[in-house]
Amino acid sequence: MGKNIKVSFKHVSKEYDLYQNKSDKIKGLFMPKSQKMQSFWALRDVSFDIHDGETVGLIGINGSGKSTISSIMSGVIPPTQGEVIINGETSLIAIAVGLKGPLTGYENIRLKLLMHGMKSSQINKLMPSIIEFADIGDFINQPIKNYSSGMRSRLGFAISVHTNPDILVIDEALSVGDQTFYEKCVDKINEFKARGKTIVFVSHSLGQVKSLCDRIIWMHHGEIREMGTAQEVAQKYDEFVKWFNKQPNDYKKKYQKEHKENQKAPQKKIYPNPNANKYRLTLFDKIFLTVLIALTILFGTLVATGKSFKGLISEESTTQIEKVVHVDNYDLKLN
């Protein structure tokens, strides 16, 4: 293609342990790998390249692995097997990802931009533009936990596009909200495309994917079923959906059950992860990392809100502090 590769997945697989309860999860920390609980392969041997300036769509039925790919691509979770190469800074736009419920919209903006390494002067300069783009009115000064899903998506999108990422990953963020905001987002996406940015667009809407994307990757129960031009793959996927919807309910249930059972089967071929040592943590490492992340988020919250630790406790209560420092977007049970 003659363009630099921005994202490369090489034989990537992602395994999750299927715990029945919290006690099983704790036991899993101490059990050797040979005695692990039953697992589920969300991805199996996935390989693709995305080039500089491309807009690539990820489509597939629920549970096909689309969001797992976007999370790995954004650095939220690591792969279990294979190699992932990202050349540039990635920003993930998904409903409520990275937004802290107890904080106001204004405070979330400051916190997110601080975590992107921006200085206070840069944040103050961007703040009016972000608030205007989000267009949520007086709710900007209300806690995120009181927002609708559409308002969360608006704010998340507004923040992410103002961080000027090299690679923009949009995971179902345009599935909520009104037509006016959707058109505003599409205009911003087209602006990014004109600037040569790389965009990965995850959606169930074939119309959106066909109009915005150059290529499509069709994920099906953790594997790539088709990959090619937007028109070709969208047509094949549309034909599959229409065929599947015509089948009797008993057949649909059997079809889905068989494929999900296959995803529980052991991986037939093992592809080593060149960064395995980087991802493999001891129990002490996991505890230390959890505390470190919690303190980092707490410190960022204090800076974003301009409050002291004592003031935050008295105003929000100890329960709210626990919510602020709760790390819900990290998979510390690394395989």
From Swiss-Prot:
Could you confirm whether the keyword Membrane appears in this record?
A: yes
Domain ABC transporter, chain residue ranges per copy: 26-246
Q: Which domain of life is it from?
A: Bacteria
* Chain positions recorded as ATP binding sites: 60-67
Query: Where does the UniProt annotation locate this protein?
Result: Cell membrane
Per the record, the major location class is: membrane
Any Gene Ontology CC annotation? plasma membrane
Q: MF terms per GO, please?
A: ABC-type teichoic acid transporter activity; ATP binding; ATP hydrolysis activity
What role does it play? Part of the ABC transporter complex TagGH involved in teichoic acids export. Responsible for energy coupling to the transport system.
Q: Which PANTHER family match?
A: TEICHOIC ACIDS EXPORT ATP-BINDING PROTEIN TAGH
Per UniProt, subunit arrangement is: The complex is composed of two ATP-binding proteins (TagH) and two transmembrane proteins (TagG).
Which NCBIfam families does its entry note?
A: PRK13546.1
- For this entry, the protein name equals Teichoic acids export ATP-binding protein TagH
Give the encoding gene's name. Answer: tagH
